[in-house]
């Protein structure tokens, strides 16, 4: 009897304990944060489809299509059941699993009205989770300290970069003005040098043409001299042959045709002819040409080579003309005709006597023509002399012009003193002062250009341009850097100049925040995208528009951030084709608000154990 009583007491105690652990029926399956929604007398369906009274809550009849009225039963297919799982992690299951004979909740709350008794295993199952949570809380505590330090450094660095950018922009403006001035002066120098070059080319061309002309004249004179020498040699031979022939013909004529009439005719003719010759030759002897030359003139070159049949006077006149420069072409021709007439006298005596009276007149005409041609030649040589003198005068004048080409500035001394920058001046002040000194010193109107001064201007221009280029490059880098969003507290500022790598199998993945992400295999690199933006409140980094997959989309990468004491990239995967994911641990995600939430969760799980034990 006593034994039965003891067993009955044990059963009653177990039943009471089970009833105590099970939540009230009206709140069964409702999350703690939603309990206030079900406190009213009339409750609205969450989808707005209708209303139901509080006494119909969990009555095992579905009044709302979305299962709002049956969170603790399996009456509604769309209903959800909340497992509190005290001492472990709470979960939500479909209402269809309630009282199905399978323990889905570690606290057994889902099988409250079934033939199965579920043991509460939440504390044992949650031990590993609690240990993990404790470690996570400790990591967050250390990470928050590191994050705060990094934020302070980032703010200082960001402000420093902003100040540097502002300073560089000011220096760029000043330096740009100096470069513009030097550019303008450099153009003036180049213009002056170009003018000087053209002047020299023109002068060299003129001198070359004069040299070529002089060489041509000398060659022409040389050819003419050779031709005259050859002509003289030929004429000398002909003259000797003519003398011999004349002597022979004279004897033959005297022997065959000697008559008194012819003798008297010849005697009358010779004195008169001689007198006429002396009369006409006298003016030429009294006024010889101003300039004589051993070299024959052009008119002498054109003298007929055939001198046969000339008299001694004619031959003498021919020889004399070579030394005096007198023209004897027409005289020789007239004398030759006269000589032939004399030879014809025996056959035509009457005509000869009639012609004798005309001989002096003919001689006068001939000599008059000779005299006129000599005068013409004289004037011709005078003109040639004048032409040579004009050329000489032109050369002298031109040389004088070239010698006086320098401007008056060549005679002036450089009274500008050299500038020495103060040791306390900055590099920009030194450049400004040096450029101003150069611009004051250099004379841009001097011709020819002073090469040393021109080189100095060019050197200052090159130096200033080089510094300006470096400043502009730095400005571009800082501007591109500062335009990015580095988080609410600049916590990601130090990510800009860093890259994080992870080796997964045969690939090496490289992520460079704010720039690009890539997949490296040996010497081959595949782009996984360029920087796009932050997502989910700075918890995800998005890289887009990478290399296109074969018959697929462009590659992309999402990097999920989590709290960690070091910056480490891991967990790279490709869940969908050409869409990659990765995890990056960093102190930047260890924020204080999240730390407080974790501490409360850990405390709640510990308090639940104490409550259960009680």
UniProtKB/Swiss-Prot annotation:
Residues 194-396 are annotated as: Disordered. Residues 352-364, 383-396 have a biased composition (Acidic residues). InterPro entries: Gtb1-like (IPR039794), Man6P_isomerase_rcpt-bd_dom_sf (IPR009011), MRH_dom (IPR044865), PRKCSH (IPR036607), PRKCSH_N (IPR028146). It comes from the Eukaryota. Residues 497-592 form the MRH domain. Residues 194-222, 231-272, 324-351, 372-382 have a biased composition (Basic and acidic residues). Glycans are attached at residue 115. Disulfide bonds join 499-512, 549-578, 563-590. Its main location: endoplasmic reticulum. Residues 1-19 form the signal peptide. This is Glucosidase 2 subunit beta. It comes from Oryza sativa subsp. japonica (Rice).
